[in-house]
Structure formats: C-alpha cells, structure tokens
Amino acid sequence: MKNRFLVGSAVFASSVALVGCGMLPGGDDKVITIWLMKDSVSAAYLDRFTEAYEKENPSVELEVQIQEWTGIGKKVMAALESDDSPDIIEVGNTQVAQYAESNGLRDLTLESVRDLGSEDWLPGLAEPGSINGSQFGIPWYAANRVVIYNKDLFAEAGIEELPKTRAEWLDITAQLDQGDQQGIYLAGQDWYTLSGFIWDENGELAVESGGEWEGRLDTPEAIRGMKFYKELQALGDGPKDSDEVKPEQEGEFAKGDIAQIIDTPNSAVQIEEKNPDLKGKLGFFPVPGKSAEAPGAVFTGGSDLIVPKNSSHRSAAVEVVKALAGEKWQTDLAKTMSYVPNKTTLADVIEGQEATAAMAVGAAEGRATPNSPKWANVELDNPIKPYMTAVLQGEDPKTAAAAADARISAALR
C-alpha cells in the first residue's frame, strides 16, 4: 500500500515538494491529495479503501492529509484560491455554499445524475451541496439526532411501545416526568432540535426572496414548531436559558434520573463512560413525527466531498469521489463508523445496529440549515437561542420571533 497519512500544513508543503505537481517518478502516475477531517473515519477504513483503490488503479497513489476542524474554513478558502490545492476535500455539509460562492469548485452535476444515483441521496446531505441547481458537494456520510432513552425507567413506568407520533411522545414523557425523575432533559436553546420541529410544520428558519435571505421564525408554521418545543421542554428540568452543552446533557443524563434526551447516538459512549451502570440500558428511537407514517424532521449533520477547480487531476479526483460515495465503500463506512450511508436505499446495510438504524430512519426526513453562503454569520451570534429562551420564559412568540428574524436577516445580507 503506497498511501501516506499526513497531518498539518507543514507536512503538506513538504509532501508537495516531494511529489512535484502531483506526479510520481513514473511519469504518468498521479498522486491524488485528499483532505479529510480529524476523526471522521478510522485509519483501518482508510487503509482498506486505499489498498483496494490503488490495486484497482495502479497509476494512482492516494495521499490522505488529516485536517483539524478549527480554522478549516479559512484554510479551505485559501486552498481554493491557490495553484496548489488538494484534489478532494471533505467539508461539512452546511459549508458547501460558502465554498461554492468562491467559484472555486468543480460542478459535479453530471456525475451525480449519471454515475452516483443522486435521486436516492439523503436530502440533508444533497440539498446543501446543490447551489442554484448545480451539485458541488457529493454526499459522503450523515449523522443526526435520535431520542436516547433509559430502558429501566421506561420499564418501571410500564411503557412497552415506543412512541411514533408527537402526541404519543408527549403522553409517555408526561408519565415519566414524576417526582424527582425527569421525563426528558431538553435545554432551552437546543436550536438544532427546534429546527426539526419547525420543518415538521412546513416552516423554515430563513428563505431567499428576491435575491436576499430573510429570517422566517415569525410565521404560523415556525411558531407552531416552537409551541411543541415548549410543551416538550416543560416535561423536564432543562435550563431555559442555555443550550445542550451548558451543562453537557450527556452528563446530566448519566445521573440516571432522566428518561430521555435528544442527541446523536455516539453520545451513548460518553454517557456510559460517565456512568458504567447504564451500559446495556440505553435505547434509541427516531424523533417522532406528527403522524405515525413518517418520523420527525431532524437536522442532518455530516460531510460532503468537493473537488476544487484548480485540482491538478480533476478527472482522477472525481473517480476517487465516485468510489468513496459508491455502494461498496458506503456500506463499509456505515458498518465501520456507525454512520448513516448517503442513500436512503442503503438503510438496510445497518440492520441490527439499533442506534444507527434509528438514526437512518430519521435521516430520511433530514434537513440542513438554510443554503446561504452567509449562514455561518447567523451561528456566530445565534439569535435563535435568545428567541427560544424568551418564548420559554413567557414572552409573546410573535414579538420574539420578529426580533430574531430582524437579526437573522441582517446577518445574511
């Protein structure tokens, strides 16, 4: 196996000098430089993929360079503007729009439709990668929130059937919210969870109108989503004025007196580390929807793969992307990392994995943040959070929503 795993820009610079314009000493061989994010995939997975790909494509060498999330936005933008960019970059699914705005990405629409079966992609990965009808980001993997529950507390309450609708969910959560026990721990500013409730009501966080983006919390649909959030949040003691990391909800759940939290399945590892008595006692189910026919909408996080326009080996890079996004290596990735694969048609590859299967059901209804290149400006000083707190503390929802919309609109312009 020829690949090298490198970390950091200093090593990147020296490796480029060694391979010289991406060519190997043989003359026609190509070095495909891939930037992957730290901890996205295991070394074992990369070893398997690289060995198999290089065996099938002997003129190609894969050079994987591991990147830190901190500061990655500026680093990618600099790479897109340089003459020495990597050939493939893993990016967060909600970051594609800002990179596409630089006009530095290769349009992969043809490959998406012709070779990759884009009609089956998860919407929460595919939609953020599509800008004005052109596909720049190729979905790679997804992760989203589910309900993590304490099986012992459910059993003690006599709950045998997991909820499939919002109404059922509220009913059992009220049953579980007794005495010193909390039915659910839901922090007041968990805006990712609120987003799903708003989407369930056919609302939006923001929309583009006349070429400009505007906040859309002050609509009947979005306000209904906030109303449901308030009902659910009241069935526990989560703080109204902070988010899910202050304090960390995994630590709160690990105390053993909380029946449910809304979190990504991999949080179960943290919970069990904090309280080993909970090993084997955690269950998972999709966030319930308004009806039993479909789960609730959820915010989908994950990664897309992009190919810079200034890649030295664009065609060869696209072939590597097609392999990574194809069924064989998507199946391997899902089983190795417990991720949701990039297509709804691959959901059966994770059967038997309770947590990942629950996540995959929800991912079919997944969405991402508004596809504005300036959405990151909203999250810097997120006005959705104080809006939520205001409503939970009794302020008129329309008044609070209008104030938040003004700030969202300003951040997007």
PLM segments and residue spans:
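Short, low-complexity disordered leader/linker segments with a strong preference
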Residues: M1-T33, K55, A406-R413
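Extracytoplasmic/periplasmic substrate-binding proteins
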Residues: M37, V96, K227-H313
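Extracytoplasmic "Venus flytrap"/periplasmic binding protein-like
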Residues: A52-W121, P128, A155-A157, K164, ...
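A structural signal for short loop-to-beta-strand junctions that line the ligand-binding cleft
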Residues: P86-D87, D115-L153, Q182-G183, A294-A297, ...
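Short, solvent-exposed loop/beta-turn-alpha elements that line the ligand-binding surface or hinge
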Residues: T109-W121, I184, E204-R224, E273-D277, ...
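C-terminal capping/gating helix-and-loop segments adjacent to ligand/active sites or protein-protein/ligand interfaces
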Residues: Y339-P341, A358-R407
